[in-house]
Amino acid sequence: MPPPETSSAAAPSPPSPDPLPPWRDQLTLRGVAVAAVLGSLLCVVIHRLNLTVGVIPALNVASGLLAFFLATAWRGAAAVLGLGHHRGRPFTRQENTVIQTCAIACGSLAFSGCSSSYIFAMDRKTYELVGQDYPGNRMEDIRDPSLGWMIGFMFLIALIGPFSIVMLRKVMVIDYKLAFPGGTATALMINSLHGKTEADLAGRKVHCLVKYMSLSFGWSFFKWFFSGVGDSCGFDNFPSFGIEAFKNTFYFNFNPSYVGYGLISPHIVNCSVFLGSVISWGFLWPFIAKQAGDWYPDNLSNTDFRGLYGYKVFIAISVILGDGLYNLVKVFLIIAKEICNARSKEHDLPVQALLQDDDSSRQLLDEKRQTEIFLKDSIPTWLAVSGYIVLAAISTVAVPIIFPQLKWYLVLVCYFLAPAIAFCNSYGMGLTNLNLAPTYGKIALFVFASLVGSDGGVIAGLAACGVIMSIVCSTADLMQDFKSGYLTLSSPRSMFISQMIGVALGCIIAPLTLWLFWTAFDIGDPDGEYKAPFAIIFREMAIIGIEGFAALPRHCLEICCVFFLAALIINLMKDVVPNHVSRFIPIPMAMAVPFYIGAYFGVDMFIGTLILFAWQKIDRREADDYAVAVASGLICGDGVWSIPSAVLSILGVDPPICMSFRPSSASV
């Protein structure tokens, strides 16, 4: 196997070597209470955004900051009220990380398992909006939301998620050294909030973080004024390279978070994402679009699986699955070899950082301490495996009671496939910070609707979508939180327990808040505030799925097979060719992300890596010392802006200006 890739920036330093609280002390009633309040807030915000614009920003950074302020306010209020004994033990960075983990676990259910996209796709209003005469849209395929079945369904499908690949946390965080940009930024922010800002390198990093966090927040606030109503205005739609390139999503959208991802991720990841943008949006999609009317009807919507959208989703997923499954098999082969040899060996894994500096002894000691703590309070493998099997067995029996259309053997298939899919999604999130759980959910929707057929396939597909989304999303969130915990010296055992507590809270809070929206507002009204834009899309996808793979456009499956094999071959080449060659071979998983998201994501990350490359050429030591702090500041500032942005949206305050562009020849 080839030597590991060189990281683009030095890893952030851990907190100073103070005595660490035991894992039990990192879990507090105060923390659970704060997480419940914060999780409820996240559920409301996510449901609100999902029902209006359908776009959900990353909220882990904002959650870490809010957890700090809420817990600090708790202790301050107790002191003011003379309840000193209620202040409890000191508020540590470990408790802050655990609270953030719990709150995200609760709030993410509003995005995944209890998503309004697939739940409202089952209701009568969406059935009527699609049209009673729409082929395949049957009155029998209606299931209106109610607290009873939603809460029960959440407990059945959500608690199992954290068990799926928790035993691979060492592979993700330590062996692969995946960046998890959002988790790294959150950890650096938490460390800065709890650290001492003495005039040393750590203090200067904190000042750098605060500086760029303020700049990023200010820029996001400034951009908001020009973003108008909808998603077609503002700097996010700036045709940087011209109108024609903009039509193919080639533009720089001035998103500080994406530039931060480029600064914090290895160069090979950023270049792979950009290469994927060029291949897909520069050549592949324009070529397929020219076949409209031949390969597929040319009058389809942008979200119809029977058209160009089908190519985008299935080809992207084929590459992701090819890369993910290759690495999953590779990991298991390495583990099996170690067991057979009865001794531990070092293995070369993708995107692993090398410390080539002669003065890196302190960083080596820091990483050694981080690793020791991360491996100290482990989650037993027998517990993870048995927990997954027991919960899967219970769910396999109980889910068909709620959704008779989804037979027990189909539920079993879901749980058989879920760990492999969860690994692929977590691996991709570690590279690019994008959670593609909704994409995997759409694939599950299509596949299981086709397996069931016209008699109940719509409801079965939508329910299977919820099962897969819940497991895949919670697993990726947990792995990202493990990265934060690794950098804040938090116990993985306390984080796993807090994840389970957060999921349990979310199983009640997410359905309750969604049901409140359902009862208080006219959900799905095309002319109203809460249009639920994805509900109709998901129902139509399920209806199309009933036809099976025959509904896909011409040559779609053949092209998918080619890209799946290409992903396997590229990974194999990286493992067999010499290091001086393999380090230039792109990563298929990273290449696949812009296939579906858009080329602008690759452009933004590539600009980030160009900045870092130039910085390293000018002053390598300064770049290694401050790149992660700058990147984290950019990510944190944009993430924190999501809080006031969501509040303004909830209050119905729209940006005053819509800045848009058109060709000069069209000017009047």
Swiss-Prot record:
<feature type="transmembrane region" description="Helical">
    <location>
        <begin position="383"/>
        <end position="403"/>
    </location>
</feature>
<feature type="region of interest" description="Disordered">
    <location>
        <begin position="1"/>
        <end position="22"/>
    </location>
</feature>
<keyword id="KW-0472">Membrane</keyword>
<feature type="transmembrane region" description="Helical">
    <location>
        <begin position="443"/>
        <end position="463"/>
    </location>
</feature>
<dbReference type="GO" id="GO:0005774">
    <property type="term" value="C:vacuolar membrane"/>
</dbReference>
<feature type="transmembrane region" description="Helical">
    <location>
        <begin position="557"/>
        <end position="577"/>
    </location>
</feature>
<keyword id="KW-0813">Transport</keyword>
<feature type="transmembrane region" description="Helical">
    <location>
        <begin position="27"/>
        <end position="47"/>
    </location>
</feature>
<feature type="compositionally biased region" description="Low complexity">
    <location>
        <begin position="1"/>
        <end position="11"/>
    </location>
</feature>
<keyword id="KW-0812">Transmembrane</keyword>
<feature type="transmembrane region" description="Helical">
    <location>
        <begin position="595"/>
        <end position="615"/>
    </location>
</feature>
<feature type="transmembrane region" description="Helical">
    <location>
        <begin position="209"/>
        <end position="229"/>
    </location>
</feature>
<feature type="transmembrane region" description="Helical">
    <location>
        <begin position="501"/>
        <end position="521"/>
    </location>
</feature>
<feature type="transmembrane region" description="Helical">
    <location>
        <begin position="633"/>
        <end position="653"/>
    </location>
</feature>
<dbReference type="InterPro" id="IPR004813">
    <property type="entry name" value="OPT"/>
</dbReference>
<feature type="transmembrane region" description="Helical">
    <location>
        <begin position="315"/>
        <end position="335"/>
    </location>
</feature>
<feature type="compositionally biased region" description="Pro residues">
    <location>
        <begin position="12"/>
        <end position="22"/>
    </location>
</feature>
<feature type="transmembrane region" description="Helical">
    <location>
        <begin position="102"/>
        <end position="122"/>
    </location>
</feature>
<feature type="transmembrane region" description="Helical">
    <location>
        <begin position="51"/>
        <end position="71"/>
    </location>
</feature>
<feature type="transmembrane region" description="Helical">
    <location>
        <begin position="268"/>
        <end position="288"/>
    </location>
</feature>
<feature type="transmembrane region" description="Helical">
    <location>
        <begin position="410"/>
        <end position="430"/>
    </location>
</feature>
<dbReference type="InterPro" id="IPR045035">
    <property type="entry name" value="YSL-like"/>
</dbReference>
<comment type="similarity">
    <text>Belongs to the YSL (TC 2.A.67.2) family.</text>
</comment>
<comment type="function">
    <text>May be involved in the transport of nicotianamine-chelated metals.</text>
</comment>
<dbReference type="Pfam" id="PF03169">
    <property type="entry name" value="OPT"/>
</dbReference>
<protein>
    <recommendedName>
        <fullName>Probable metal-nicotianamine transporter YSL5</fullName>
    </recommendedName>
</protein>
<dbReference type="GO" id="GO:0035673">
    <property type="term" value="F:oligopeptide transmembrane transporter activity"/>
</dbReference>
<feature type="transmembrane region" description="Helical">
    <location>
        <begin position="147"/>
        <end position="167"/>
    </location>
</feature>
<keyword id="KW-1133">Transmembrane helix</keyword>
